[in-house]
């Protein structure tokens, strides 16, 4: 067998180098040689015939070749279902003019008992004038004679007793008209051709005539009666209709087959769904394991750093956080040397169920809270605060369920929260998180805040050392605490008598902080946006409140905010060690708390002189809370938990306006100082993304995890994309230029005005229509500013597609500002129930495909080499930038490169300015997958499938490499690229005979089409530099002239379209 395989490989090599015009003759010689030398090896002969069938199946010049038909008949002998094989040949047009195919096919059907179908096959061959005609007609006459011979014995037995099957036939004959009898159903009902009924009628008439002739030859059979029962010969399998004493009808038989087929389809569907679920579970487990390993590493690093820094903790001041606010009624200024607040999540509540949080996100919170807020030896920064009230808006919390009391029947709260940090240069640890509160300093420095049990397991010993708190005589109590709270706090008061100032001091409730005002993205995008979409609130360090017992002076609240609201402004700075199980645990852990209860003297408030270095080297964040009303009567005891949460809230309804106050001078100066710090923004971004939660549904990975290769079948699967969008740390709906509408998408028509919030849009005309969307040119203007008018595009899709908008926003966030113009810019997204409208930048001068077609009408027929090199250099740079953001475009082709007005206006050295990459609907964000993920699916655009897809190999970034190569090929030759595999090397099918710079282009296409694997991608910068060098050497004097000529062609093309 090995010898035969070697011989076959030699034969294949011979056929690849064969240049004759009759390859079938070579196959015929080889098969004859195999039959002579290996007559007993039938399996190999069958394999050889199968290869021959595949080789010549689509070569129409051999479809009626007698040699090829002979091999098809031989191959049919080895086929278990010959009828299906002959049907396949007939549908492919093979042997339609050969009598041997029809004779073999009809003979097989006759052997199976399907006489009616066999007769139809004979008649089909005669109708198609199959050669040789005489042989086919002779075989058909013999078939009819055999059919008559079968009928004659049955005629002599008509007077004998009938069996059950014959009774059934007799009933059918007497109760059915001749028209109904002609519609008898054969065995293979599903595959019967439409001409069978007519052929059946012809057959019966022929049989009737032959019976009359036999009666003249002294046959005793009556000519008037005998032919009729013979014409009713049953043409179906009686065994399937008769089962013992019962009989099936045709409908019941069909129903039985239908049920069997449905069961099979259901089984296949369930098996497919099971495999998808299995793959998804493995995918999630891989992500979870990967992130857990990374978090373990970070926790170990934190522990090592904490142990190293522990001896010097007494000489180190800390950075503390606060959510400061101002009451909208009083509007008084708050000042303090340190703004600190460490909030906790409610561990147990007597009146409502606590919201369970997964363990993994808590670990991420622990890492962030430890890494992002280290201590610093810097002076304190006072932050005076002022604010103004907000109007009718609501803060929706999407991560935890908390209670928000209302201040009136028509009052709603708005929480616009960022992060605030202030620096404390005192040796003692103050507590000013609750407003203008005086407290006694303590010499015990706060230990690192820990939020997970696993982290506590590592650094528990750090909190067990005894402390020596200072003694204070101030023992004011909080007047708003109820009896349960007083009893709880009394434990600390008792400790204060003997060991120092551990009592609860006088605490004032915080009013709402000043709000932040941002007037949209007009500066960034150049498009006026609806200003009724407030930013999503992000509250750092808030904790939920337990249900309070009703009091006579307590404000009523509705059930609407029982579970999904956020309490803003109320802070209680209790930091505990291990996670408490009961109130008693707080008592034992009170002296180990990192921030005990103090008052802080008002005379220690100082303004640092050097404001520029306030946060010079710190990983700090500034947070600003804005709430409309925050007057809450604390009527019942609160249970504290050590878990610190980050709550994000957003307002999806675009119909509610929001206003806000401005920063005070000190706060703005602090923010500017923060911008000047040397923070590694990439590190902070990764850590903030990790802090968003590592749910099972979320598949976002850390940037520096070296995970093994993971295979995903189809990155464009709708369910997978919905899963990725739902697991984002920053949802698409939280962007300030995203608007959700609770109505259906309106029908977009040209020459019509539409109102989108404060944006008035006039649809001018349809620019293009693809398989997934329609693109309109529109003129928009702000309702509040009649002079503002600008052209844009409206991309209308059904159903809603927020994925493209997400990719566009991620590109703008991850790319450098100087390259933003190279990619499509979306001004806003409007999401409806059944569709979406993306408002984006307009490019007026057509796509690269239009440019290629324009040159086809010139004498050159193709684009000049200088322009090809210019555009190719820009394309390689674009793709390089996209890949550096860990994004795959996925649909690079000539009609997705577009020219805008910048191409006509720019006259600098960058001659390709104005070329932009559009259509991000097929893009893939690799940051949402484990590092090293590969894909196996195929894109829908068959002409742009990369070699990895054609050879069923895994791929990721290769799809963009192939897209660039195919686009450049289209510019060079004016046609789409087709590739072929020659000896394992992929090449374009076109000839490169008179192409300038042949060596360079052959090397380029070889590199782009023959990528070793997903982990060894070629350098786009290397290819770009080679082209740039060639362009400067050969075409530096011609390129501007060619570019100006193209500008004229584009301008004329634009005018012709109008």
UniProtKB/Swiss-Prot annotation:
Span of the annotated motif Nuclear localization signal: 58-65
Pfam name, any one: Pkinase
Phenotype upon gene inactivation: Early embryonic lethality.
Matching InterPro entries: Bub1/Mad3, Kinase-like_dom_sf, Mad3/Bub1_I, Prot_kinase_dom, Protein_kinase_ATP_BS, Ser/Thr_kinase_AS
Expression sites (tissue/organ): Highly expressed in testis. Weakly expressed in spleen and lung.
Motif KEN box 1 in this chain: 522-524
Entry protein name: Mitotic checkpoint serine/threonine-protein kinase BUB1
């Amino acid at each position: 067998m090995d010898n035969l395989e070697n011989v076959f490989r030699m034969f294949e090599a011979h056929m690849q180098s064969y240049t004759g015009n009759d390859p079938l003759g070579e196959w015929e010689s080889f098969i004859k040689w195999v039959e002579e030398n290996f007559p007993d090896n039938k399996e190999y002969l069958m394999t050889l015939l199968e290869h021959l069938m595949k080789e010549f199946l689509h070569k129409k010049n051999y479809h009626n070749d007698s040699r090829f038909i002979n091999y098809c008949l031989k191959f049919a002998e080895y086929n278990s279902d010959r009828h299906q094989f002959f049907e396949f040949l007939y549908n492919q047009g093979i042997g339609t003019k050969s009598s041997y195919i029809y004779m073999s096919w009809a003979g097989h059907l006759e052997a199976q008992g399907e006489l009616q179908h066999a007769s139809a096959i004979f008649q089909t061959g005669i109708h198609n004038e199959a050669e040789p005609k005489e042989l086919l007609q002779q075989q058909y006459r013999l078939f009819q004679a055999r059919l008559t011979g079968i009928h004659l014995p049955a005629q002599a037995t008509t007077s004998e007793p009938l069996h059950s099957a014959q009774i059934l036939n007799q009933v059918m004959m007497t109760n059915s008209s001749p028209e109904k009898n002609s519609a008898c159903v054969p065995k293979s009902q599903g595959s019967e051709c439409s001409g069978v009924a007519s052929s059946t009628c012809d057959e019966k008439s022929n049989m009737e005539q032959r019976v009359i002739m036999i009666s003249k030859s002294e046959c005793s059979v009556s000519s008037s009666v005998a032919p009729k029962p013979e014409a009713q010969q049953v043409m179906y399998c009686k065994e399937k209709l008769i089962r013992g004493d019962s009989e099936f009808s045709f409908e019941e038989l069909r129903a039985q087959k239908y049920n069997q087929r449905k069961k099979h389809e259901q089984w296949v569907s369930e098996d497919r769904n099971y495999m998808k679920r299995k793959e998804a579970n493995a995918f999630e487990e891989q992500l979870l394991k990967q992130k857990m390993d990374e978090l373990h590493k970070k926790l170990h690093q934190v522990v090592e750093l904490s142990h190293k820094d522990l001896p010097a903790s007494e000489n180190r001041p800390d950075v503390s956080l606060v959510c400061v606010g101002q009451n909208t009624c009083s509007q008084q200024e708050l000042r303090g040397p340190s703004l600190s607040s460490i909030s906790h999540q409610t561990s147990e509540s007597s009146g409502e169920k606590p919201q369970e949080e997964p363990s993994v996100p808590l670990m991420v919170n622990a890492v962030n809270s430890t890494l992002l807020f280290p201590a610093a030896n810097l002076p304190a920064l006072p932050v005076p605060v002022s604010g103004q009230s907000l109007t009718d808006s609501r803060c929706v919390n999407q991560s935890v369920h908390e209670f928000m009391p209302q201040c009136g029947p028509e009052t709603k709260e708005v929480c616009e929260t960022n992060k605030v940090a202030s620096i404390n240069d005192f040796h003692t640890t103050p507590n000013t998180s609750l407003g203008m509160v005086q407290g006694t300093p303590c010499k015990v420095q706060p230990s690192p805040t820990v939020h997970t049990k696993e982290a506590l397991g590592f650094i528990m010993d750090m909190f067990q050392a005894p402390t020596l708190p200072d003694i204070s005589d101030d023992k004011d109590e909080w007047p708003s605490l109820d009896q349960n709270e007083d009893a709880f706090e009394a434990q600390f008061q008792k400790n204060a008598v003997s060991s120092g100032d551990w009592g609860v001091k006088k605490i004032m409730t915080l009013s709402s902080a000043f709000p932040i005002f941002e007037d949209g993205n007009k500066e960034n995008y150049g498009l006026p946006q609806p200003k009724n979409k407030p930013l999503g609130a992000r509250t750092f360090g808030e904790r939920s409140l337990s249900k309070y017992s009703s009091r006579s002076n307590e404000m009523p609240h509705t059930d609407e905010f029982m579970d999904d609201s956020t309490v803003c402004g109320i802070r209680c700075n209790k930091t505990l060690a291990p996670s408490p199980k009961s109130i008693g645990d707080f008592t034992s852990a009170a002296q180990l708390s990192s921030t005990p209860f103090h008052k802080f003297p008002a005379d220690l408030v100082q303004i640092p002189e050097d404001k520029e270095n306030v946060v010079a080297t710190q990983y700090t964040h500034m947070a600003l809370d804005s709430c409309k009303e925050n007057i809450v009567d604390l009527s019942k005891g609160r249970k504290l938990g050590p878990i610190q949460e980050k709550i994000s809230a957003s307002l999806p309804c675009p119909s509610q306006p929001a206003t806000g106050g401005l920063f005070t001078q000190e706060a703005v100066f602090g923010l500017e100082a923060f911008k000047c710090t040397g923070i590694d923004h990439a590190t902070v971004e990764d850590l903030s993304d990790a802090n968003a939660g590592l749910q099972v549904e979320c598949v976002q990975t850390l940037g520096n995890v070296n995970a093994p290769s993971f295979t995903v079948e189809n990155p464009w699967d709708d369910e997978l994309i919905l899963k990725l969008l739902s697991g984002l740390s920053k949802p698409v709906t939280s962007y300030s230029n995203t608007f959700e509408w609770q109505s259906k998408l309106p029908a977009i028509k040209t020459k019509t005005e539409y109102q989108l919030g404060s944006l008035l849009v006039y649809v001018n005309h349809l620019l293009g229509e693809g398989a997934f969307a329609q693109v309109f040119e529109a003129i928009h203007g702000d309702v509040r500013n009649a002079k503002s008018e600008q052209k844009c595009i409206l991309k209308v899709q059904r159903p809603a597609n927020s994925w493209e908008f997400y990719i566009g926003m991620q590109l703008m966030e991850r790319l450098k500002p100087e390259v933003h113009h190279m990619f499509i810019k979306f001004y806003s997204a409007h999401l409806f129930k059944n569709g979406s409208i993306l408002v984006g930048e307009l490019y007026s001068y057509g796509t690269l495909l239009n440019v290629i077609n324009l040159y086809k009408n010139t004498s050159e027929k193709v684009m000049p080499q200088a322009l090809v090199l210019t555009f190719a250099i820009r394309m390689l740079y674009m793709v390089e930038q996209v890949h550096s953001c860990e994004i795959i475009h996925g649909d690079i082709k000539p009609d997705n490169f577009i020219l805008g007005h910048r191409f006509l206006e720019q006259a600098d050295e960058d001659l390709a300015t104005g070329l932009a990459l559009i259509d991000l609907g097929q893009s893939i964000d690799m940051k949402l997958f484990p590092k090293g993920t590969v894909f196996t699916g195929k894109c829908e655009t068959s002409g742009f499938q990369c070699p990895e897809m054609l050879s069923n190999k895994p791929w990721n970034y290769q799809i963009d490499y192939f897209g660039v190569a195919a686009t450049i090929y289209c510019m060079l030759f004016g046609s789409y690229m087709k590739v072929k595999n020659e000896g394992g090397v992929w090449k374009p099918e076109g000839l490169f005979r008179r192409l300038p710079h042949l060596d360079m282009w052959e090397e380029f296409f070889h590199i782009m089409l023959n990528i070793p694997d997903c982990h060894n991608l070629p350098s786009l910068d290397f290819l770009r530099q080679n082209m740039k060098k060639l362009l400067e050497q050969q075409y530096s004097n011609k390129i501007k002239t060619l570019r100006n000529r193209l500008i004229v062609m584009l301008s004329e093309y634009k005018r012709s379209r109008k």
